[in-house]
């Protein structure tokens, strides 16, 4: 009697009470991800799916009406959604990052106002924060500030309700203001000019500001962006998000490659087997990729746990502890990047030439990872780790620290 073989799940899919929602959203996103990757543009229907899912308020504390989910759980969700659709995972993750910005920089009254509205009005946040783009100028005026200029890499600005905006006020990395502005504010123009080879639907194009007024109460703080080691954890969240997007793409690529090899790949004539899955070289390569990815995931989980512990320390977090977390996160990111670049390329060695047909879109995993690994040079991450090991000097926590 024939039996159906049991294939164990390659990766854990436990998100506690949120498991049904996360898997439902991931399944829906995966169904059209390859087609939408080719189209680019703004994924309006999929953004609405995220709105309707209730997942946009995960990082909002329960005191403001949110779920108050722990960061390691949120990061695992980013990974799982990136497995299905890297662009929408990016938007989901950046939503949580903007919420964290309000928690880290905002006054109690600002937190109550903007996080309460995030829940009550189901806000989708965008950003115009890119620290390296200093073309956005700010001048003091009565009762606030005037913004003129442009910001690039403004992920999620399209179709957003509110923007987290940063402006440079001086030469030091700490000379920055963070502002919260409605996307529809007079003078703000969100441009549909994102057309990169990967992360095709993150809407990471430019936002222009023409004599945009920002009232004093719309500037986050006190405490502000440079008030304590805790405040610099925003940058750490950004680094972890990149790590999880790498890992999610690698997971998606490996799962698709295994499925394709089982069902469609033709064995190589010299392998001496009737099925590709019986080719010992393909078995070897697949086992190596799986082990590489599992090791990278384990390191990421360790870093995420350390981050949660740092987050919970609040203002008691000191510079040394912040540096240790930063180095662990850097180790996770560099390891995940190497693993993901390797896996998203090597899957074609399993599947063969037919798998390069454009309709499959298997190359999107590599393109997504390649774009995101260029966010800031990984060699400098490794250099910082080496310097820290030799001298105990922690990374600069500002900018990309």
How would you describe each model-predicted region?
Residues 23, 248-251, 287, 291-294, ...:
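Generic structural signal for well-ordered, non-transmembrane alpha-helical segments
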Residues 34-37, 295-334, 348-351:
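C-terminal helix-coil-helix/basic helical segment that borders enzyme active sites and/or dimer interfaces
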Residues 44-51, 57-159:
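Glycine-rich flavin
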Residues 153-157, 238-242, 375:
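Glycine-rich phosphate/pyrophosphate-binding beta-alpha loops
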Residues 197-294:
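Glycine-rich beta->alpha junctions and the first turn(s) of the following alpha-helix
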Residues 349-401:
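Glycine-rich phosphate/cofactor-binding loops in nucleotide/flavin-utilizing enzymes
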């Amino acid at each position: 009697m024939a039996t159906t073989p049991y294939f164990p799940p390659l990766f854990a899919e436990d998100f506690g009470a949120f498991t049904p929602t996360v898997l439902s959203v991931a399944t829906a996103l995966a169904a059209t991800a390859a087609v939408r990757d080719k189209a680019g543009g703004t994924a309006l229907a999929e953004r609405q799916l995220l709105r309707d899912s209730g997942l946009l308020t995960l990082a909002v504390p329960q005191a403001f009406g949110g779920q108050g989910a722990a960061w390691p759980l949120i990061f695992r969700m980013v990974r799982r959604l990136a497995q299905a659709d890297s662009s929408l995972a990016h938007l989901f993750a950046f939503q949580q990052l903007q919420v964290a910005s309000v928690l880290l920089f905002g006054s109690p009254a600002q937190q109550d106002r903007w996080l309460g509205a995030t829940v009550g009005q189901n806000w989708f946040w965008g950003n115009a924060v890119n620290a390296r783009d200093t073309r956005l100028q700010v001048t003091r005026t009565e009762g606030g500030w005037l913004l003129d200029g442009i910001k690039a890499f403004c992920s999620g600005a399209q179709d957003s309700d509110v923007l987290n905006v940063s402006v440079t006020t001086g030469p030091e990395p700490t000379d920055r203001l963070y502002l919260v502005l409605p996307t529809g504010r007079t003078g703000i123009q969100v441009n549909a000019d994102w057309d990169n080879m990967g992360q095709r639907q993150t809407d990471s194009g430019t936002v222009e500001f023409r004599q945009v007024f920002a009232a004093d109460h719309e500037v986050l703080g006190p405490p502000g962006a440079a008030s304590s080691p805790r405040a610099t954890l925003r940058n750490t969240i950004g680094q972890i998000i990149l790590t999880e997007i790498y890992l999610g793409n690698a997971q998606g690529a490996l799962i698709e490659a295994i499925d394709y090899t089982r069902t469609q790949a033709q064995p190589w004539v010299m392998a001496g087997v009737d099925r590709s899955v019986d080719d010992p070289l393909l078995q070897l390569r697949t086992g190596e990729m799986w082990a590489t990815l599992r090791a990278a995931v384990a390191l990421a989980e360790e870093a995420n746990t350390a981050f949660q512990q740092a987050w919970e320390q609040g203002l008691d977090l000191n510079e040394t502890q912040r540096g240790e977390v930063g180095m662990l996160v850097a180790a996770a990111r560099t390891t995940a990047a190497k693993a993901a670049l390797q896996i998203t390329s090597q899957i074609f060695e399993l599947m063969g030439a037919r798998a390069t047909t454009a309709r499959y879109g298997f190359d999107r995993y590599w393109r997504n990872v390649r774009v995101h690994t260029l966010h800031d040079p990984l060699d400098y991450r490794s250099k910082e780790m080496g310097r820290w090991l030799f001298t105990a000097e922690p990374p600069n926590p500002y900018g990309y620290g």
